[in-house]
Amino acid sequence: MVTFTVTDKEHGEWAVLRVSGELDLMTSPVLRQRVHDVVAEGRHSLVLDLSEVWFCDSSGVGVLIASRRLLRSCQGNLRLILPARGAADGSHVNKVLGALGVRRLFEIHADVPSAVDGNSRPLSA
């Protein structure tokens, strides 16, 4: 059985959820609930660190899009962390988002420090 974990940290005004494992039909409800919990606590600046996610299906992408929509509805910010390089020139999640044409919807950074830095520019789409 593959382990799926979501850990929570704070970096100043930013909440950071570090996700590891497979983001799929079975695990995406866990991430969805954690995002809702963060927003319910009044934290509207969120980084989803997906650098340790090695598989993502359409359910996982759906959670990412729903998270973006939720945070935008409360004037919040969502940033994703995907490694600039990884499994054959990019992470699996990066490839899936690109193949579905939704990568451009997200502000993507290489690591937590760049994601929470107000002066850092996101990686190109």
Regions found by a protein language model. Give the residues of each.
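Helical "lid/switch" subdomain of P-loop NTPase nucleotide-binding domains
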Residues: S59-G60
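STAS-like cytosolic regulatory interaction modules
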Residues: M1-W54, A66-A125
